[in-house]
């Protein structure tokens, strides 16, 4: 029990608020990201390793979800073929706003070594990408670092309920 009564209010009786609602909402958003793993090739193995006990993605507040309707972050890991492009777009459209996309690996970024008619040469041609992870295949630490960069990006954004969806120009 405290022996002294501390008055945290001003003379008006109103408490002092030292933050903005944007910072509070963005802090909550950045520390509880639910990711949908869209693993297509070798990079998916490294992405699955981030959820294991050695790297422990959960300590950053990120939980992998199987449903697009419960996810805020989409991690595209691997070669995106033209057959998968329509499905990837539908899954992206099913995600609630605000939503972010991480493109993981050279194949997801640029098509990789597969320069054929059946491979999309970069998933940013189908959906807007926020963070690109280079490498073949990127290590789990790289995905964790990308998540921390995404958290910083979310904290800087303006928390607006009437956000316009991201569009490709």
Curated annotation (Swiss-Prot):
Membrane topology of the entry: Peripheral membrane protein
Cofactor remark: Binds 1 [4Fe-4S] cluster.
Molecular-function annotations in GO: 4 iron, 4 sulfur cluster binding; iron ion binding; NADH dehydrogenase (ubiquinone) activity; NADH:ubiquinone reductase (non-electrogenic) activity; quinone binding
Binding site for [4Fe-4S] cluster: 42-43, 107, 136
Catalysed reaction, written as an equation: a quinone + NADH + 5 H(+)(in) = a quinol + NAD(+) + 4 H(+)(out)
Key words of the record: 4Fe-4S, Cell inner membrane, Cell membrane, Iron, Iron-sulfur, Membrane, Metal-binding, NAD, Quinone, Translocase, Transport, Ubiquinone
Cofactor annotation: [4Fe-4S] cluster
Location of this chain's protein in the cell: Cell inner membrane
A GO CC term attached to the entry: respiratory chain complex I
Family note: Belongs to the complex I 20 kDa subunit family.
Subunit (UniProt): NDH-1 is composed of 14 different subunits. Subunits NuoB, C, D, E, F, and G constitute the peripheral sector of the complex.
Protein name: NADH-quinone oxidoreductase subunit B
Lineage, opening ranks: Bacteria, Pseudomonadati, Campylobacterota, Epsilonproteobacteria, Campylobacterales
């Amino acid at each position: 029990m405290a022996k002294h009564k501390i008055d945290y209010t001003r003379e008006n009786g109103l408490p002092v608020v030292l933050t903005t609602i944007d910072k509070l909402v963005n802090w909550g958003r950045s520390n509880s990201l639910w990711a949908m793993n869209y693993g297509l090739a070798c990079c998916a193995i490294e992405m699955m390793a981030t959820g294991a006990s050695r790297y422990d993605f959960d300590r950053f507040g990120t939980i992998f979800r199987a449903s697009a309707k419960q996810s805020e972050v989409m991690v595209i890991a691997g070669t995106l073929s033209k057959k998968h492009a329509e499905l990837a777009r539908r899954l992206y459209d099913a995600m609630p706003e605000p939503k972010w996309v991480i493109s993981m690996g050279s194949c997801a970024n640029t098509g990789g070594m597969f320069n054929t008619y059946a491979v999309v040469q970069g998933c940013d041609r189908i959906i807007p990408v926020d963070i690109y992870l280079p490498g073949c295949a990127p290590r789990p630490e790289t995905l964790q670092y990308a998540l921390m960069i995404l958290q910083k990006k979310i904290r800087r954004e303006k928390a607006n309920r009437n956000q316009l969806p991201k569009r490709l120009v």
